[in-house]
From Swiss-Prot:
<dbReference type="InterPro" id="IPR033983">
    <property type="entry name" value="Thiazole_synthase_ThiG"/>
</dbReference>
<comment type="similarity">
    <text>Belongs to the ThiG family.</text>
</comment>
<comment type="function">
    <text>Catalyzes the rearrangement of 1-deoxy-D-xylulose 5-phosphate (DXP) to produce the thiazole phosphate moiety of thiamine. Sulfur is provided by the thiocarboxylate moiety of the carrier protein ThiS. In vitro, sulfur can be provided by H(2)S.</text>
</comment>
<comment type="pathway">
    <text>Cofactor biosynthesis; thiamine diphosphate biosynthesis.</text>
</comment>
<feature type="binding site">
    <location>
        <begin position="204"/>
        <end position="205"/>
    </location>
    <ligand>
        <name>1-deoxy-D-xylulose 5-phosphate</name>
    </ligand>
</feature>
<dbReference type="GO" id="GO:0005737">
    <property type="term" value="C:cytoplasm"/>
</dbReference>
<feature type="binding site">
    <location>
        <begin position="182"/>
        <end position="183"/>
    </location>
    <ligand>
        <name>1-deoxy-D-xylulose 5-phosphate</name>
    </ligand>
</feature>
<protein>
    <recommendedName>
        <fullName>Thiazole synthase</fullName>
        <ecNumber>2.8.1.10</ecNumber>
    </recommendedName>
</protein>
<feature type="binding site">
    <location>
        <position position="156"/>
    </location>
    <ligand>
        <name>1-deoxy-D-xylulose 5-phosphate</name>
    </ligand>
</feature>
<keyword id="KW-0808">Transferase</keyword>
<comment type="subunit">
    <text>Homotetramer. Forms heterodimers with either ThiH or ThiS.</text>
</comment>
<dbReference type="Pfam" id="PF05690">
    <property type="entry name" value="ThiG"/>
</dbReference>
<keyword id="KW-0704">Schiff base</keyword>
<keyword id="KW-0784">Thiamine biosynthesis</keyword>
<dbReference type="InterPro" id="IPR013785">
    <property type="entry name" value="Aldolase_TIM"/>
</dbReference>
<keyword id="KW-0963">Cytoplasm</keyword>
<feature type="active site" description="Schiff-base intermediate with DXP">
    <location>
        <position position="95"/>
    </location>
</feature>
């Protein structure tokens, strides 16, 4: 069981809502993935009605909705979006995303830390999307973030865990859940993140852009479960040289 703030999750696979061909496919894929936490960009909402074509189905699906601040370019804009989410969706949970560069969508560490500090002071449950920077993760933890969400590689790139050496450090040091977010493009990559000891992964593009999103959601669910089980079982140590798997009895010397 994964606990973030006061909420418990059975599934350690979190999903997104973008890039699906239809809301029907999206909902079916989410069900197939067994995900219990789904993130959605506030910029997709019609501010006049407080809705879009996927919000109502999501609210009725039983998943926990995690609004995000995608599109915010600085702390001020992100805080505004978080306050809007609390008013419209009646939630104090927010996925904090600040990426001023629209080409590479790299998260701004300075603005993210500033926004996180203020939002935590206002009582939000803040889950910041950030570079895989162990120092920044520690600072975000210190200001009160409920979890940290370091990237595996650029958003939507499907490049996998390009930041693995830094993810290992973050996981080792963290006192809050570590959710690997962005760039996970295959179930094997999600499995690897869980083997490292990540508490959860967030996957969107790899599922939504699949030829069969429903089946792919199921594949990711199985991969995350297997990776977590492998981590708990304890992986064998990696060696640079061969190690005998059978005892040396010397029986050949007796011939």
């Amino acid at each position: 069981m994964l606990k973030i703030a006061e909420h418990e999750f059975h599934s350690r696979l979190f999903t997104g809502t973008g890039k699906f061909s239809s809301s029907k496919t999206m909902l079916a894929a989410i069900r197939g993935s067994e995900s219990e936490l789904v993130t959605m960009a506030m910029k997709r909402l019609d501010l006049k009605t407080g809705s879009d074509d996927i919000l109502s189905p999501l609210l009725h699906s039983g998943v926990k909705l995690l609004p995000n601040t995608a599109g915010a370019r600085n702390a001020k804009e992100a805080i505004f979006v978080a306050e809007l989410a609390r008013e419209v969706l009646n939630t104090n949970w927010i996925k904090l995303e600040i990426h001023p560069d629209p080409k590479y969508l790299m998260p701004d560490p300075i603005e993210t830390l500033e926004a996180a500090r203020e939002l935590c002071e206002k009582g939000y449950v803040v889950l910041p999307y950030i570079h895989a920077d162990p120092v920044l993760c520690r600072r975000l933890e210190e200001v009160g973030c409920a979890a940290v969400m370091p990237l595996g590689s650029p958003i939507g790139s499907n490049q996998g865990l390009a930041t693995e050496p830094f993810l290992k450090i973050i996981i080792e040091q963290a006192n809050v859940p570590v959710i690997v977010d962005a760039g996970i493009g295959a179930p094997s990559q999600a499995l690897r993140a869980m083997e490292l000891g990540a508490d959860a992964v967030l996957v969107n593009t790899a599922i939504a852009s699949s030829a069969d999103p429903i089946a792919m959601g199921q594949c990711f669910a199985q991969a995350v479960q297997t990776g977590r089980a492998a981590y708990l079982a304890g992986l064998g140590q990696v060696s640079q040289q061969a190690i005998n798997t059978s005892p040396l009895t010397g029986f050949l010397n007796d011939q």
